[in-house]
């Protein structure tokens, strides 16, 4: 174990500010009103306000990673008579398909391939052909490739067909402006350690209250019962059903404060966009090519093809970058040899410039 701090160029966990880390130095009692009312309830209100100004929405915090919340939503929102259309073009859409299968949830998997944008006309045709579909679920920012999926167009379809709409906005909420009411989203799922720039430990769901209230008794799990977690927080002023990740929650409260100080989601989105554009321009100047065309990219993470040089090994490239204080991600695309670089978190223009210099130094196969 090393005490050296690296710059994490990943989609989360990510590099956090010193003050977010310092917020975890305080020990909270999970029964204390200062914590539940003063911190948890404030977070819930702030998250809902970030998602929409419209009435009728609420937020629920849930222990665990983002996948725990995805599974909680699927397992709680769909009744035994329901069926979900899962739009998948990467590992995280595929994970929803796997979850649905394990929980015995009726589903239709529309897999459009890892490097293709979902075809909205194809989704329209599926909905038209199968009236038993009651829900639609999809990922917004698919970090497998860095693709940003068309949640607005699919939301319009969900509204037109009267379907419940579930969006995994794990790596976009807080970093890309959105109004979930305008997008017709019924359940939005995200995590503490993504664009809000907190640390791992809990995820959250922002839901249409009317939909959530109908979930009573549906859950396939005790601990992942979204309705029960919501009622506990509502009825007990922020109390969690089971042990609250107190230090992570305090860090998240500080991260929300820093998001506001930066200028809100619009300002953070602008920084992320500039980071990503500078990264892509610099990498192309070094001879790297992006997996996706520019119009498909999110401002969150970018996949680059691995060099074709026979001397290149990702593990060696990674090691040389890490020696210089930078950590990147291996590829996750099954049919393409690539690696990924994220640009969210406490990462600024000077960091991208320093990273590009480090990459040039680490390109041992060109020496």
Curated annotation (Swiss-Prot):
Modified residues (N6-(pyridoxal phosphate)lysine): 194
TM segment ranges: none
PANTHER family: 2-AMINOETHYLPHOSPHONATE--PYRUVATE TRANSAMINASE
Coiled-coil annotated spans: none
Gene Ontology molecular functions: 2-aminoethylphosphonate-pyruvate transaminase activity
UniProt protein name: 2-aminoethylphosphonate--pyruvate transaminase
Keywords: Aminotransferase, Pyridoxal phosphate, Pyruvate, Transferase
Cofactor section: pyridoxal 5'-phosphate
EC number: 2.6.1.37
GO terms of biological process kind: organic phosphonate catabolic process
Top-rank taxon, per record: Bacteria
Quaternary data: Homodimer.
Leading EC class: transferase
Catalytic activity of the protein: (2-aminoethyl)phosphonate + pyruvate = phosphonoacetaldehyde + L-alanine
Pfam families cross-referenced by the UniProt entry: Aminotran_5 (PF00266)
Recorded family membership: Belongs to the class-V pyridoxal-phosphate-dependent aminotransferase family. PhnW subfamily.
InterPro entries recorded: Aminotrans_V_dom (IPR000192), NH2EtPonate_pyrv_transaminase (IPR012703), PyrdxlP-dep_Trfase (IPR015424), PyrdxlP-dep_Trfase_major (IPR015421), PyrdxlP-dep_Trfase_small (IPR015422), SP_NH2Trfase/AEP_transaminase (IPR024169)
């Amino acid at each position: 174990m090393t005490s050296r701090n690296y710059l994490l160029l990943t989609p989360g966990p990510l590099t956090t500010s010193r003050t977010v880390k310092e917020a975890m130095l305080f020990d909270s009692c999970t029964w204390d009103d200062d914590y539940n009312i003063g911190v948890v309830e404030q977070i819930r209100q702030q998250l809902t306000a970030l998602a929409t100004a419209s009435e009728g929405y609420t937020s629920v915090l849930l222990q665990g990673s983002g996948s725990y919340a995805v599974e909680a939503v699927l397992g709680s929102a769909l009744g035994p008579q329901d069926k979900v259309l899962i739009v998948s073009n990467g590992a995280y859409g595929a994970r929803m398909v796997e979850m649905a299968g394990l929980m015995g949830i009726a589903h239709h998997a529309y897999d459009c391939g890892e490097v293709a944008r979902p075809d909205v006309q194809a989704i329209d045709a599926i909905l038209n052909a199968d009236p038993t579909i009651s829900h639609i679920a999809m990922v917004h920012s698919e970090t497998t490739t860095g693709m940003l999926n068309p949640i607005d167009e699919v939301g319009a379809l969900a509204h037109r067909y009267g379907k419940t709409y579930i969006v995994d906005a794990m790596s976009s909420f807080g970093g890309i402006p959105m109004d979930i009411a305008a997008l017709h989203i019924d359940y939005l799922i995200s995590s503490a350690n993504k664009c809000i720039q907190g640390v791992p430990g809990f995820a959250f769901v922002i839901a249409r209250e009317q939909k959530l209230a109908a979930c009573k008794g549906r859950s396939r799990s005790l601990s992942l019962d979204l309705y029960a977690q919501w009622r506990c927080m509502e009825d007990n002023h922020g109390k969690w059903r089971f042990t609250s990740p107190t230090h992570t929650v305090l860090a998240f409260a500080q991260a929300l404060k820093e998001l506001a100080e930066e200028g809100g989601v619009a300002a953070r989105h602008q920084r992320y966009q500039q980071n990503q554009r500078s990264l892509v321009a610099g990498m192309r100047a070094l001879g790297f090519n992006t997996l996706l065309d520019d119009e498909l990219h999110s401002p969150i993470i970018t996949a680059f093809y691995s060099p074709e040089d026979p001397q290149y090994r990702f593990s060696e490239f990674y090691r040389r970058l890490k020696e210089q204080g930078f950590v990147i991600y291996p590829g996750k695309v099954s049919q393409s040899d690539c690696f990924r670089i994220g640009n969210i978190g406490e990462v600024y223009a000077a960091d991208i410039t320093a990273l590009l210099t480090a990459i040039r130094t680490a390109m041992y196969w060109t020496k």
